[in-house]
């Protein structure tokens, strides 16, 4: 049977429709048809006829004589196309990207025979060459070009990208100079100079500070050159702000040779000198510190550069980098976000093993978190501490996370310096063209162990035998230039001697200085702010606001647009707010919160609120964004204050986040770090879930100022309260936050009135310094009939760290009960029921810093009190009890609460309420 007989039934109209779809979007049709039409384009050119005419002609020629030359030619054109597509898809598996050894054999065959061609076809000219940017040429030349494009020192993965235009751009970009960058003699010498700086810097430290940890870059020295060329090119492309995050590996080298940190300061850190700062600053190890620098390109363009400080917890800084970048885009680059460039440098083991990488990568296309694309660079040592890569990932490459969001990957041999720079420039071009993420897999090695005092041959003796014989990238590149006749060895020696002399001079100067100087990070953004003293943190702050202004804001917040349709429940929410505010003068929690934001917006501050479900609020109390019934158009009254009512100067941003605590909290920490005039808030869905971000709390939020001399005003709203919902929906782990409190590092509050919450939020922006603020927010109090404030309370009041009991006769009080948060209302209800006027209930609204002087005044009021109690609903080993035990010694007091439990709460509602009521009863015994 004729194997082409099926073509007799071909419908010209069907071909035409399918071809139209192919032209519109090649990815929309079945892959085999896509391959057919790629070849058909060539055939159409050959016949010089429209598709409707060409199809019957081709079908007739194929059917009438299988052996005739035109049909053979067409069939082989298809085979060449298949070969080209195979190289595009699998060529990276055959690249020469390992500087230590040839790659292990891959289960891929890109021979011409595999695709139905033979050596007899090598000199046949094929039109398919146009697919790789060539004129019609021989198969021999096509194969040679394919090997240059896809199988040399740079391997590219991109065929999984769904957008055809992106793949086509990559194809065209690769075809320029056969996937290389042409370098002038000047560029090559500049490249050699940067390699020399990278190598000589490490050699200098290795000899001057023997055995000290520095986490050498050696084996991936070309990172410095790649970054240097990328920064220069970025400035030329209009980038004005660059934010870089990286771990310890090679950090000192990047600080010195990319960011221009004075080696003198690095040497001071190696010498272990004390800091010039006072006791409120403890500092950090040298390979964690950040820097802000301004670099001027060779053509005079300036670029603000920031290397973000970070802890040893790998990959955490990635989310922080994204947040800082977004803040800079919102402030400086509203016209073009691509002017701010985030770069994240990963380790090969960490990028595979740390889940925050996935959380951060998922942000790249989300409207509340996207930053116009991030350049990810994996410094691939082929080993993680002592663990071989075969034990640290299941994927072929360390960069396979890139496929989650259709990011291209460039795998590059770190010994090929020109290929490295080419890959870095390629990545920059891609990011600026599409505003999407791109990954570079910089495959090198680690010359020493994990640190310079570690013995790597315990675990990788074979690899380190190879490394011991391997020359460094500088010498390899220098020899290449010598072979090309561009330089002589004397130039290399001169470079090395000059740079060493420079470092020697800095070392001599450094050793004359008694102290280490830590320069401020992002000083431009933080001009006018100061480090707060303990007394300043407890000073009252004026948070009043004109009542008329508040009234106008309330009017905007309670008026639905008449020309929009909303579901009845939305109408009721807004109507109830209007009635409560203007008829009853009852401001509930949700309304007070929105008024706080609105008031700050009118004063020129910005507000950013993110977290899971924050637009509506987990407990349906906020409704900051309303949706129309028919189109789901978003209506945000707080944005209308600026854009429709011209009442506000600042912008209001509120975004439902991806379902992430760790990554999103890190992002918001970064945002607040770069935007001190923005009230930056992260709300947990339930406070219980905030411990999913524990690393961010422990390593950044609680101690960033103490370690890195950076302030951060991030607000965390953590719903907390025991209401019978079980162990996972009751406790924000108050005890853990209080355990982190020391040296004036943050505020911790547990408010009980809408007005106090209102003033607390305003205070966060009104101080001349910034501290993180942790607020344990209520759940049941959101609609509690007693939890209301008046408009006057908001306009005229201030934040009250302690709320004394307004009991009529303080002289009658025999027992003073201190408590915090929603538990107060349970105690209050019981006291009212019992008619006990001998017991005063004192609310501590700010737990840290503890307002000791105010507490003294409160205690002094109750001159006849002999019994002092700390009461809490949390178990004894949780809540604020342990903290109060350490810090509250004004009077001798006793604990009333449940005993210690392993879980925060019982899963049985009956048991939970029984325990709860027993505590209340004990308070009034």
Language model: regions and residue ranges:
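Subset of Sec-pathway N-terminal targeting signals
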Residues: 1-40, 44
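Alpha-helix capping and helix-loop boundary segments enriched in small/acidic/polar residues
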Residues: 6-9, 71, 214-221, 304-315, ...
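Extended, charge-enriched "interface" segments that sit outside catalytic cores
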Residues: 40-222, 239
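Flexible, glycine-rich loop/tail regions that form catalytic "lids" or insertion modules at the edges
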Residues: 75-85, 92-127, 144, 199, ...
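Active-site cores of enzymes that catalyze phosphoryl transfer or operate on phosphate-rich substrates
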Residues: 179-201, 272-322, 326-333, 637, ...
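Active-site pocket-lining segments that scaffold enzyme catalytic pockets across diverse folds
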Residues: 200, 204-264, 579, 587-601, ...
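Cofactor-binding active-site loop characterized by glycine-rich and histidine/acidic residues
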Residues: 240-406, 410, 619-676
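Conserved phosphate-handling catalytic cores of large alpha/beta enzymes
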Residues: 384-395, 403-439, 443-449, 457
């Amino acid at each position: 049977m004729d194997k082409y007989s099926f073509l007799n039934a071909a419908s010209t109209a069907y071909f035409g429709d399918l071809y139209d779809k192919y032209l519109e979007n090649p990815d929309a049709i079945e892959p085999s048809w896509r391959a057919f039409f790629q070849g058909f384009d060539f055939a159409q050119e050959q016949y010089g006829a429209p598709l409707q005419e060409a199809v019957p002609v081709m079908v007739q020629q194929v059917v009438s004589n299988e052996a005739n030359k035109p049909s053979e030619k067409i069939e082989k054109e298809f085979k060449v196309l298949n070969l080209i597509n195979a190289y595009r898809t699998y060529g990276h598996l055959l690249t020469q990207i390992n500087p230590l050894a040839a790659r292990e054999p891959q289960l891929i065959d890109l021979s011409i025979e595999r695709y139905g061609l033979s050596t007899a076809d090598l000199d046949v000219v094929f039109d398919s060459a146009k697919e790789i940017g060539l004129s019609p040429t021989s198969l021999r030349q096509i194969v040679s070009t394919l090997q240059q494009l896809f199988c040399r020192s740079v391997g590219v993965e991109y065929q999984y990208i769904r957008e055809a235009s992106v793949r086509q751009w990559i194809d065209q970009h690769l075809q320029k100079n056969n996937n290389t960058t042409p370098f002038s003699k000047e560029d090559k010498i500049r490249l050699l100079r940067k390699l020399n700086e990278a190598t000589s810097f490490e050699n200098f430290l290795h000899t001057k500070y023997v055995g000290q940890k520095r986490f050498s870059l050696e084996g991936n020295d070309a990172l410095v050159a790649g970054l240097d060329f990328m920064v220069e090119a970025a400035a030329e492309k209009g980038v004005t702000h660059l934010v870089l995050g990286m771990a310890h590996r090679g950090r000192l080298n990047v600080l010195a040779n990319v960011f221009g940190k004075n080696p003198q300061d690095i040497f001071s850190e190696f010498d272990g000198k004390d800091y010039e700062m006072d006791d409120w600053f403890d500092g950090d190890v040298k390979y964690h510190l950040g820097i802000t620098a301004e670099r001027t390109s060779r053509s005079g363009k300036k670029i603000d550069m920031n290397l973000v400080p970070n802890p040893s917890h790998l990959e955490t800084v990635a989310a922080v980098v994204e947040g800082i970048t977004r803040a800079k885009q919102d402030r400086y680059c509203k016209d073009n976000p691509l002017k701010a460039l985030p770069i994240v440098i990963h380790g090969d083991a960490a990028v595979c093993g740390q889940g925050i990488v996935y959380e951060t990568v998922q942000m790249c296309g989300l409207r509340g978190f996207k930053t116009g694309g991030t350049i990810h660079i994996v410094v691939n040592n082929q080993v993680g501490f002592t663990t071989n890569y075969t034990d640290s990932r299941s994927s072929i490459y360390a960069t396979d996370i890139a496929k989650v969001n259709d990011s291209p990957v460039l795998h590059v041999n770190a010994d090929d310096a020109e290929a490295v720079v080419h890959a870095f420039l390629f990545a920059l071009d891609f990011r600026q063209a599409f505003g999407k993420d791109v990954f570079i897999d910089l495959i090198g090695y680690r010359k020493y162990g994990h640190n310079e005092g570690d013995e790597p041959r315990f675990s990788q003796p074979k690899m380190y035998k190879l490394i011991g014989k391997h020359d460094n990238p500088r010498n390899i590149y220098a020899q290449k230039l010598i072979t090309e006749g561009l330089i002589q060895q004397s130039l290399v020696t001169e470079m090395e001697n000059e740079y060493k002399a420079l470092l020697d001079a800095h070392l001599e100067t450094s050793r004359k200085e008694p102290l280490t100087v830590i320069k401020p990070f992002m000083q431009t953004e933080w001009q006018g702010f100061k480090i707060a003293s303990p007394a300043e943190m407890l000073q009252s702050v004026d948070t009043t606001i004109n009542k008329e202004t508040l009234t106008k804001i309330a009017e905007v917040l309670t008026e639905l647009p008449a020309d929009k349709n909303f579901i009845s429940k939305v109408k009721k929410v807004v109507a109830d707010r209007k009635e409560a505010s203007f008829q009853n003068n009852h401001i509930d929690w949700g309304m007070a919160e929105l008024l706080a934001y609105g008031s700050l917006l009118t004063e020129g501050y910005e507000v950013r609120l993110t977290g899971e479900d924050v637009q509506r609020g987990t407990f349906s109390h906020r409704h900051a964004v309303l949706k129309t019934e028919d189109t789901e158009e978003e209506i945000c009254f707080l944005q209308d204050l600026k854009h429709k009512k011209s009442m506000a100067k600042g912008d209001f941003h509120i975004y439902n986040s991806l379902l992430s605590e760790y990554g999103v909290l890190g992002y918001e920490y970064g945002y607040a770090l770069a935007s001190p005039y923005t009230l930056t808030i992260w709300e947990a869905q339930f406070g219980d879930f905030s411990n999913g971000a524990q690393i961010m709390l422990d390593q950044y939020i609680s101690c960033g100022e103490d370690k890195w001399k950076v302030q951060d005003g991030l607000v965390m709203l953590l719903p907390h309260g025991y209401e019978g919902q079980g162990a996972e929906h009751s406790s924000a782990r108050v005890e853990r936050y209080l355990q982190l409190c020391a040296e004036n590092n943050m505020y911790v509050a547990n408010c009980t009135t809408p007005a106090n919450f209102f003033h607390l939020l305003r205070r966060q922006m009104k101080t001349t310094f910034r501290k993180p603020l942790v607020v344990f927010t209520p759940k049941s109090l959101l609609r509690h009939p007693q939890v209301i404030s008046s408009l006057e309370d908001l306009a005229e009041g201030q934040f009250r760290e302690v709320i004394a009991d307004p009991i009529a006769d303080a002289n009658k009080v025999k027992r003073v009960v201190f408590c915090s948060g929603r538990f107060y209302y349970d105690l209050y209800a019981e006291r009212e029921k019992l008619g006990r006027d001998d017991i005063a209930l004192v609310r501590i609204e700010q737990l840290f810093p503890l307002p000791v002087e105010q507490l003294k005044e409160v205690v002094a009021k109750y001159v006849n009190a002999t019994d002092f109690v700390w009461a809490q609903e949390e178990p004894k080993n949780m809540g604020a009890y342990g903290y109060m035990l350490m810090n509250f010694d004004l009077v001798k007091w006793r604990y009333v609460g449940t005993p210690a439990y392993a879980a925060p709460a019982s899963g049985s509602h009956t048991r939970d309420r029984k325990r709860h009521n027993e505590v209340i009863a004990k308070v009034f015994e």
